[in-house]
Amino acid sequence: TQLLYHRYKTFNGDMSKGLIIFPCELIFLNGHKLKETIYQYIELWNLGNEFKTWFEEACGVYATLVDRIVPGFPRKDIAAIKEKLQYDDNLVVQAEVFHLWVIEAPQEVAKEFPADKAGLNVLFVPSEAPYHERKVTLLNGPHTVLSPVAYLSGVNIVRDACQHEVIGKYIHKVMFDELMETLNLPKDELEKFANDVLERFNNPFVDHAVTSIMLNSFPKYETRDLPGLKTYLERKGELPKGLVLGLAAIITYYKGGVRADGAEIVPNDAPEIMNLLKELWATGCTKKVTEGVLGAEFIWGEDLNKIPGLAAAVKADLDSIQEKGMLETVKGIL
């Protein structure tokens, strides 16, 4: 807001000096959220109706969606990369070749920002909603639940999870039998997208650590998987076993401790979530753990204990994981 106001004052409200803004925060309709926030600051700081009019008419704020798997710094290969470059670059970022940037804006904006002319996969579309729903549900959703299931089974890389005899079947079940059933898009289109996602998960050149995905798992589940769980229950009259197990796996991961192979389990989330899980697991009672997590409205925005059968199903999975281990529990739902 201050940047825009300074520009407005510098150019004396010249309507040709507005800016085109593409916010990149990973939230739905980020452009709409940014506009709302700017309006709030205009009011809060009493910047005036003339500036507000200039912002509305001279500037454009457009929602965007980015789709690319970016594991980050390639620690395993950095020595070879430095040797090839012949200099030290500590800002190297590993990413898959696939990329998509969807911008909800008219074609006039595309003329101002012709990224597609540079060979980049950038789409200017009337609505980002279908792209957002498809990506969040069939890429981010599986990521969120497969990661704790894989990690607690001793598997550290997404690709290895997909190729695992048991976990691979679990991922396929969640994607094709559960999450796909909740989307209102042509089935052939969804199947193609899901198969493309699996191909990306299996990328032999990208070692995507599941621990990097598990950061802030509860908020991720709330946005990526919970809507699908609710829709599936509404349409099928039963809970999706894979998504329920994914939630139980997240809760188990936040217990901490040590894996069977001796690796230390180190969850990472907001302090209030970490403290809640620590207190609940200290009771030693999976019923209290389940009801406490599902009832945490500061996580979910509601009491998930009210979803028919969910508490009992999550508790049953927690008990099974404690008694039989993760892999045997996964086998039980396939």
Residue ranges of each PLM-predicted region?
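Substrate/ligand-engaging "lid" and interaction regions
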Residues: 1-334
